[in-house]
Each structure stands twice: as C-alpha cells, then as structure tokens.
Curated annotation (Swiss-Prot):
Any GO molecular function: DNA binding
Species for this entry: Bos taurus (Bovine)
InterPro entries found in the cross-reference section: Deoxyribonuclease-1_AS (IPR018057), DNase_I (IPR016202), Endo/exonu/phosph_ase_sf (IPR036691), Endo/exonuclease/phosphatase (IPR005135)
Protein name as annotated: Deoxyribonuclease-1-like 1
TM annotation in the entry: none
Length: 316
C-alpha cells in the first residue's frame, strides 16, 4: 500500500501527466484575415516583402487576403510557391475571387489554406442586386478534417470607408444568404471592416445589426489596434463568429503585431502593409487527427485507478 507521502507524489505525477496529455491535444486551427495593402507582383517580387509575407501566412491554416490588386494573376502564384517552400508549413492552395470594384480600381479576395487540413467545398460571389457593396463578399464553404467542426463558412468583406455602416448592415443579409444556402450556423465574417475611428463612431457601431442581433461574437474586440502606424489606434479589422459550436471552440483572438515579432521598423513594416493581420484560434486538433477529445473525467479515472485500487483494497 502507498504511504501518504508516496500517494500524494503519485497523484502529483499523474496530474502532470494529465496536463501533458491535454496539452498534446491543445494545438489550434488558425483563421486569419489580412489587408495586404495593394498587393501586386512588383510588391511581392521584393525579397524583404516576400519573406515577411511568407512568415505571416505560414502562421495561418486559412488566410483571407484583401486588397490583392494584381490583374496579371502572377502575384499569388509566386507567393504560393514561396510559401510552399517555407519549412513544413504547407502544402497550401489558393482560391480567388474575380477583381471587384465600381471603378478602374479593383481588388480580389484571396483564400490561402493548408490543403491537408481544409478544402474548398463550394463558393460563390454574393448577388449584390442593390449594389450596396463596393466589393461584394466572396463566400467560401470549407470542409475541415474535424469531427468536432466538419465545415464552416467564411464571409470576407473589405468595406469602403465612405459606406461602412451601409455595407456592414448589408453583411447581415450575406450571412443569412450563406447560412440558408448551406444550412449551417457556423459562419465567420472577417476582414477590413473600417469599423472604428472616423469611419464609424462608437454609437453607429453599436447600432449595427451585427451588434444588436443575438448570436454574433465580435472576437476582435473594440479597442484592439489593428494598424501599423504609431500615430493611429483603430480597430479597423475584425473577425465575427456566429454559431454556438464555433464560439465554444474559440481559444484566442488577436491582431498579430508582425513588426514587433519580426523586428521591423515602422517603415519596413509599412512596406508590407499599414494593417496588422487579425486571427482567431479554434480548438480542433483532436478532431484534425480523427480523434474525439476524451472526457476529462475519463482521463482522471484512467490515471488514478491504478493508484486507488490498492487504497480501496481492489487488488486481487
């Protein structure tokens, strides 16, 4: 029979083992959005810019790029090629919208995603019959290697600063359209919403349908700075989650301060973008490997039973 001290040490050791077991399943699935500020082939071809972009992208399982203005369709293939050469982060694939906009200036939405973790199940350009959006959302339904969350829908939007309120209220209709089309509640709205500072006052922000309607969680909270310049402090870029299951899997949300992480000066960072990427982490790792997360009580019992059996006289 264990002595009291020995038993306590054994309990302590098994508790540590339990934590290690739980931690081994604690890797997360990261979804990001990044306004890459007028991304062209000329910009991507600059080595310092390309290197930094690759390091930013390699942190994400799914990335939605905005302000891709490359009409030659060569910038993303170059970026994708270098991303797939970077360490063991890949393989990545891409899925792009058409060029969008009302004038000669047009942008694309581009999804970059780890193809062994996610795949595009379906996608469509929102039918903006009332022409409320300057760049209508390019909605994408992803299948995930997860039994916890087999699929989710992403709805990106880069608003125009002069019509932020109109576009963000119309984004609720896009949510309803996508949710109804694919019969899912697990939807993420994300992108450069311009949802702060002079583009959208706090009062107007709080009156948005996406703020007053129940069921939406603004993961990138008000007050988080998503801008690179030291002279600005605005929460322009947002990620909004809908769906109880999806929200229950949220483990973190942040703006990624890439200048600080990569040791860049402000000017060096501005060569990349004047925005930080924003990101959410979802706890899908057990399911990514095809295994459901074990119940905490089950883990405790499996670890403690060998210790408790002698104490309870259960040993034959």
């Amino acid at each position: 029979m264990h002595s009291s001290g020995g038993f306590q040490k054994a309990i302590h050791g098994h508790a540590l083992l339990l934590l290690l077991l739980l931690a081994s399943g604690a890797e997360t699935f990261r979804i990001c959005a990044f306004n890459a500020q007028r991304l062209t082939l000329a910009k991507v071809a600059r080595e310092p810019v390309l290197d930094t972009l690759v390091k930013i992208l390699a942190r994400c399982d799914i990335m939605v790029l905005q302000e891709v203005v490359d009409s030659s369709d060569t910038a993303i293939p170059l970026l994708l090629r270098e991303l797939n050469r970077f360490g063991d982060s890949g393989p990545y694939a891409s899925h792009s919208s058409l060029l969008l906009g009302r004038s000669t200036y047009k942008e694309k939405y581009v999804y970059l995603y780890r193809s062994h973790e996610a795949e595009v199940r379906d996608s469509y350009m929102y039918d903006d019959q009332d022409d409320l959006f300057t760049r209508e959302p390019f909605v994408c339904w992803f299948s995930l290697r997860s039994k916890v969350l087999p699929s989710l829908v992403l709805v990106p939007l880069h608003t125009t600063p002069k019509a932020v309120e109109t576009e963000l209220n119309a984004l609720y209709d896009v949510f309803l359209d996508a949710s109804g089309r694919w019969q899912t509640k697990d939807v993420i709205l994300l992108g450069d919403f311009n949802a702060d500072c002079t583009s959208l006052t706090k009062k107007r922000l709080d009156d948005l349908v996406l703020r007053t309607q129940a069921g939406f969680h603004w993961a990138i909270a008000d007050g988080v700075d998503t801008t690179v310049r030291a002279s600005t402090h605005c929460t322009y870029d947002r990620i909004v989650l809908h769906g109880e299951l999806l929200q229950s899997l949220l483990r973190g949300a942040a703006a990624f301060d890439f200048p600080q992480s990569f040791g860049l000066t402000e000017q060096e960072a501005l060569n990349i973008s004047d925005h930080y990427p924003v990101e959410v982490d979802l706890a899908l790792s057990w399911a990514v490997h095809g295994v459901q997360p074990p119940c905490l009580a089950t883990l405790w019992l499996s670890l403690l039973l060998p210790l408790l059996a002698p104490q309870l006289g259960l040993v034959a």
